[in-house]
């Protein structure tokens, strides 16, 4: 990773010229702009503009029974279950990371219920799941102190007894090995850039493995058009705000009648700490400072083995103040006396960030569509109070595999797997989400204190099988929740000390992030004039603050401000696609293998 001074950046000027340019490329407008015609084609493709004005390249095709996009816990569970049901079923898993696990970032405290169902003997199979939770602690933080909340005051579902502290990336690497042993084909480094549509309008496959476009989108000397991977069914397990999932949700109106999806930004570091301060199996969650009234969110500190701890911070993206900087809130959190004492004398070894779905039951779209399904976080199956979704992701993969196997056994293909959607809503996943459905909207409306009191009460009553509140709505999307800058005071953050807190570019260097600079920018602007002409005067252009990797900058020049996109820094969190108040930024996949390379996240 290099900073903007040594890497190709995309620069957008004001509307007086409406010009987008790259410092190394005269035609960079093609690399970032999505015109009105392309914007109206929701559900066809959102690849770079240059490729859309050319004829489609000729591509070879490979056919499978099931094509799975994403080698996360959901996609790999589906692949394994399909092969368990019928070893003759052909299954391929496509992963955009350089290896399985490279793009996986999660807390993570794993509820093993999904894995128990998928691989009951996982404990004897060498799974990298070896640190059981031994202690739960909950704290309310003030700026200078903390109050521990008695465990007995917490709803039973917040108890982590029987769960495990894991590196989800390593769990996925292990699951991929088990899938391959069963005959699943797993291809890392394969970004899925387009959907292949069937003649009847169903999802028939995906385009994967396109490489070698120039910055302006035209084919370069070593251009590879990729392949069409066609399936009787296509499972989308891309994770939060997946680029293909987003198209499918719009095309088939899967969110019609649902509440807007809500999101958080999760940031995580791995620290090696003093053995005297380490307590393997301890799980700590905090609320309150430094966010307090500015936004919802909280932290986690998980003590795994080898004197390491996961230190994480989540900021709900429905905050109103465009001056808020989620990354700096995380860095400030580590200076709390309780946290600083834990980390004193330690060493940070990794950093990453990823959006989290938080809408829950009210926002869950229809999960089946003609030709495929949405798995796990692509649909939004996270239990927000528990900060857990991996168990539901695994269960969704199992349900999808069973529904597709039943359909193919009956000679069906390309239809809507209604039994999958029913299994998600009426089974363990639906019950898990329904119990906590009101916590997030209570927090969003009335703040932390109300969420602890009223939300906690609602979780208690739901444990008993009823709710006095019914089902509360979310109202605005996170983008719509952003208010004009004139209504808020700018937030002054302390400078990082280089010991506990760090600047964004330094942190990105701890994520292993890398992008080939000669490719088109994967962060598209529907209208290149909006950042400077609208977002800057109205919202003080929040992209320069909400991005946890320093991708976006507003640089003052003699002839006016410029909007700069340092796409090489992108850690694929998707926050820009979610939080941009004008919904002008569209996150698309870069070349396969690019992005972060998380070792043990």
Protein language model regions, located:
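C-terminal auxiliary extensions adjacent to catalytic cores
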Residues: 443-499
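Predominantly flavin-linked oxidoreductase catalytic cores and closely associated redox partners
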Residues: 169, 173, 178-341, 399, ...
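FAD-binding beta-loop-beta segment adjacent to the flavin cofactor pocket
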Residues: 353-384, 507-518, 531-546, 553
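N-terminal Rossmann-like FAD-binding beta1-loop-alpha1 element of flavoenzymes
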Residues: 64-92
